[in-house]
Each structure stands twice: as C-alpha cells, then as structure tokens.
C-alpha cells in the first residue's frame, strides 16, 4: 500500500516536471505577441489576405474599406489608423456596429483585435 502511494507520487512528480518544462519552453512562443502600432505594418500584414475565424471572412484593404461576411450576413465598413489604433465603422447586414478603436496584436499567425483601445473584448483572426 505504501509502495503504491510512493509510486503515485513519483508519477505526479514526473508529470509535474514535464508540465513545467513544457511551459518554460513554450512560454516564449506563447508570449511573443507584438502590438501593431503603425498603419504600414498593419497594411503589410493584411495585404491580399483574408481575416478568418469561425463563420467570418473579412478583407481589410489599404484604401480604408472592410468587406466580407459573418454568420451569413454581408459585412462592410471603413477603417483608419488613429493614434496607434485600428478605428472602424461596421455594418453587419442591416445592423450598424458602433464606431470603435481597437488595439491590434500579432503572434506570427493570428491578428487579435482588442476593442475599446485595448481595454475591451478581443477577437483573433487567422490570416489566409
């Protein structure tokens, strides 16, 4: 009984060590999100790409337009870069979404838009 208990502790320690090792190795990769603060950097990322997530596909063009679809409805809008933030107006079908300036980050694969100048909710999009 005691031997089984000690074997269980050894298994937990091995698992714990592997778990900690994984996060020590993976954390620089996970933490490599960069804030995009300049319009040309943003434009270079989205040029000729679609921003996609479940049921959403958008194009953001360098002439300040947003076009695409979300949940079966057309999406259209305008955007500009103001004081380091992506600021947009947006129509989703017949519904107007309020004007919002968003912080944008990039992790090497996905763009993340954080509403209310980085203080609100976020949505991540794959670039394809």
Task: Describe every region a protein language model picked out.
Residues 1-14:
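N-terminal secretory signal peptides that target proteins for export/translocation
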Residues 10-12, 29-128:
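Lipid interaction determinants
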Residues 16-27:
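Bacterial N-terminal signal peptides
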């Amino acid at each position: 009984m005691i031997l089984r208990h000690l074997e269980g502790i050894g298994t937990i320690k091995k698992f714990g060590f592997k778990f900690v090792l994984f996060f020590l190795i993976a954390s620089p990769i996970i933490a490599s999100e960069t804030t995009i603060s300049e319009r040309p950097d943003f434009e270079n990322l989205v040029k000729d790409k679609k921003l996609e997530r479940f049921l959403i596909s958008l194009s953001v063009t360098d002439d300040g337009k947003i076009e695409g679809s979300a949940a079966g409805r057309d999406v259209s809008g305008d955007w500009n870069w103001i004081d380091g933030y992506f600021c947009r107006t947006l129509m989703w079908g017949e519904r107007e979404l309020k004007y919002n300036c968003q912080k944008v980050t990039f992790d090497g694969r996905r763009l993340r838009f954080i509403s209310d100048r980085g203080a609100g909710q976020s949505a991540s999009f794959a670039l394809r």
